[in-house]
UniProtKB/Swiss-Prot annotation:
Protein name per its UniProtKB record: Prostamide/prostaglandin F synthase
Localization, UniProt: Cytoplasm, Cytosol
Record GO terms (molecular function): oxidoreductase activity, acting on the CH-OH group of donors, NAD or NADP as acceptor; prostaglandin F synthase activity
Protein's job: Catalyzes the reduction of prostaglandin-ethanolamide H(2) (prostamide H(2)) to prostamide F(2alpha) with NADPH as proton donor. Also able to reduce prostaglandin H(2) to prostaglandin F(2alpha).
Taxonomic lineage from the root: Eukaryota, Metazoa, Chordata, Craniata, Vertebrata
SUPFAM superfamilies documented for this protein: Thioredoxin-like (SSF52833)
UniProt xrefs under InterPro entries: PXL2A/B/C, Thioredoxin-like_sf, Thioredoxin_domain
EC numbers: 1.11.1.20
Chemical reaction(s) catalysed: prostaglandin H2 + [thioredoxin]-dithiol = prostaglandin F2alpha + [thioredoxin]-disulfide; prostamide F2alpha + [thioredoxin]-disulfide = prostamide H2 + [thioredoxin]-dithiol
Family to which the UniProt record says this protein belongs: Belongs to the peroxiredoxin-like PRXL2 family. Prostamide/prostaglandin F synthase subfamily.
Source species of the chain: Salmo salar (Atlantic salmon)
PROSITE patterns according to UniProt: THIOREDOXIN_2
Length: 200
């Protein structure tokens, strides 16, 4: 993937959960930030990943690092918030311009089916189910997501991750390493999967 230019993407507008419009760059102006771009708020894998990333929140806060979740639409936001899946601030990219500028692809109706049935997504859904995390199929099923970690003031991109499959996510140790912090968290147990079944 080409190098991300923060200046143009930084001027994209997001909507806070309270309805206020903010520029993306305002999120890294005063502190480093971990930006988690969800596929959608009802996505079971996204909910599990949000809960997993939230394990880092105390360590991020202790180091003055913001944790932010961004969704491509408002659909499912209320249920996502009520479920307590994510400990950071939440925003909506209503125009999906950040998603486009950061290279988070859109599936087609034909390409989403094999992606959704792949081994990676089965592994994560097994983890989610084991933790009682459910999902739904409301909203835009074709949008992918990823992560962007930016240094304070937008000095540089510390990590840019684009989902190749809906089950892809950044391991907690990679997030900590990108930020050069140590975190006292235990990642969720990884299930063992073959082509037919996943077990814990």
């Amino acid at each position: 993937m080409a190098k991300i230019e923060l200046k143009p993407v930084g001027t994209n507008l997001l909507k806070s959960v309270s309805g206020e419009s903010v520029e993306l760059q305002s999120l890294w102006r005063d502190k480093p930030v971990v930006l988690f771009f969800l596929r959608r708020f009802g996505c079971q894998v996204c909910r599990w990943t949000a809960a997993e990333i939230s394990k880092l929140e105390p360590d991020l806060t202790a180091h003055g690092i913001a944790l932010v979740g961004i969704g491509p639409e408002e659909t499912g936001l209320k249920e996502f918030k009520e479920g307590g899946f994510f400990k950071g601030d939440l925003y909506i990219d209503e125009k999906k311009q950040c998603y486009k500028d950061l290279g988070f692809k859109r599936y087609t109706a034909l390409s989403v089916v094999p992606a959704a049935l792949g081994k990676k997504i089965r592994e994560v859904t097994t983890k989610a189910k084991a933790q009682g995390i459910q999902g739904n199929f409301t909203g835009d099923l074709l949008q992918s997501g990823g992560m962007l970690i930016v240094a304070k003031g937008g000095e540089k991109v510390l990590l840019h991750f684009v989902q190749d499959s809906p089950g892809d996510y950044v391991p907690l140790e990679d997030i900590s390493k990108a930020l050069d912090i140590s975190a006292n968290v235990q990642a969720g147990e990884r299930p063992q999967c073959n082509d037919d079944v996943c077990t814990r």
